[in-house]
Regions:
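N-terminal secretory signal peptides and thylakoid transit peptides that target proteins
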Residues: 1-20
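N-terminal active-site segment of His-dependent metallophosphoesterases
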Residues: 27-98
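Extended active-site neighborhood of metal-dependent phosphoesterases/phosphodiesterases
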Residues: 31-33, 55, 59, 95-200, ...
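Alpha/beta-hydrolase fold active-site loops
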Residues: 37, 82, 150, 158, ...
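Active-site glycine-centered loops adjacent to acidic/histidine catalytic or metal-binding residues
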Residues: 44, 88-89, 123-124, 210, ...
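Short, solvent-exposed loop/turn segments at secondary-structure junctions
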Residues: 49, 93-94, 214-217, 222
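Short acidic, glycine-rich surface-loop motifs adjacent to enzyme active sites
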Residues: 199-217
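Histidine-centered catalytic micro-motifs
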Residues: 207-213, 240-250
């Protein structure tokens, strides 16, 4: 199939109440269990004018990410999702800051083709390429999130929280010449802010980050303060999902009823058949349904 893998077609169709033959699926949602919000998500495009890495290492097809992102945006436009979000490492760092900025402007143009709100999460490669202030100035988050690296927004009773783990444990911000992919950490100010957002949230909460927040990210793939964060999420009783990137091969864990979904990297592998992105549906009960496209895994969980 052109826009998604065959293994995901039936699940995707059923998510919208139709089978491949156009008939109602047996497990389609009841009228009172329609999604309250749907969004598209991708991560780790690592776009840049750089040659692909080759085996035995992971193949990162840097230049191809513009075409892969175009497919993602076209698909989400056709699905009419409420918004889209990228989970970091939008660009691959280049020795030349000017070339890194040119890459960011190019991939942002593709991202901005979406007919609705768009949001960004900062990754370690973004910060290695471009200072935080310049990155947020050259990208366009929707609404009050514009010009911010960490922020929250609400859509149809669901609160979404975007975290910026681009700090060292001593509070020093990461940036060009001072990044470490194994040492992601929130700033002190963000912890105070996070407590306030969770306290104010009146419904379900979904968290976006670049670093993983579950305990299974080996070798620095999980944020250093993830244990503390999971306790905060559990105590709030409001968080139903955490979406992250950073670990290019993806993963999923359910801890205390919270789904920790790590999306596979868009840049991994050559050709559109090696693309990776997903559509997420959130239901009134807190059920979360992830419909994976191409290499992305499909998952469903309930709190």
């Amino acid at each position: 199939m052109d826009m998604m893998t065959r293994r995901n077609f039936t699940l995707t169709a059923c998510a919208f109440g139709l089978s491949a033959a156009g008939t109602l699926c047996a497990d389609s949602a009841a009228p009172d269990e329609r999604p309250v919000v749907r969004f598209g998500v991708m991560t780790d495009s690592h776009f840049g004018d750089l040659d692909s890495t080759r085996p035995p290492h992971e193949v990162r097809a840097f230049r191809e990410s513009a075409r892969k992102l175009r497919e993602f945006v076209d698909t989400m436009n056709s699905r009419k999702v409420d918004f889209i979000v990228e989970l970091g490492d939008f660009v691959e760092h280049h020795p030349s800051k000017e070339k890194s900025l040119a890459s960011l402007e190019r991939i942002e143009r593709e991202f901005s083709r979406f007919n609705g709100p768009r949001y960004h999460v900062l990754g370690n490669h973004d910060l290695q390429a471009i200072p935080r202030e310049e990155f947020v100035r050259h990208t366009a988050n929707a609404g009050e999130a514009k010009g911010r690296a960490h922020y929250s927004f609400e859509k149809n009773t669901v609160t979404f929280i975007v975290l910026d783990h681009g700090y060292f444990a001593d509070g020093v911000p990461m940036g060009p010449g001072r990044t470490d992919w194994t040492k992601g950490h929130l700033s002190v100010e963000q912890w105070r802010w996070l407590d306030g957002v969770l306290a104010a949230a009146k419904g379900k909460v979904i968290v976006f980050s670049h670093w993983r927040l579950d305990p299974m990210g080996h070798g620095g793939l999980t944020a250093l303060d993830a244990d503390r964060m999971r306790e905060v999420f559990k105590k709030s009783g409001k968080v139903v999902a955490s979406f992250s990137g950073h670990h290019h091969y993806g993963d999923y864990m359910n801890i205390d009823g919270i789904g920790y979904y790590c999306l596979k990297a868009m840049c991994t592998g050559s050709g559109t058949e090696n693309n990776s992105y997903a559509e997420v549906s959130v239901y009134p009960s807190g059920k979360v349904q992830v419909t994976g496209f191409r290499r992305a895994e499909s998952k469903i969980w309930t709190p």
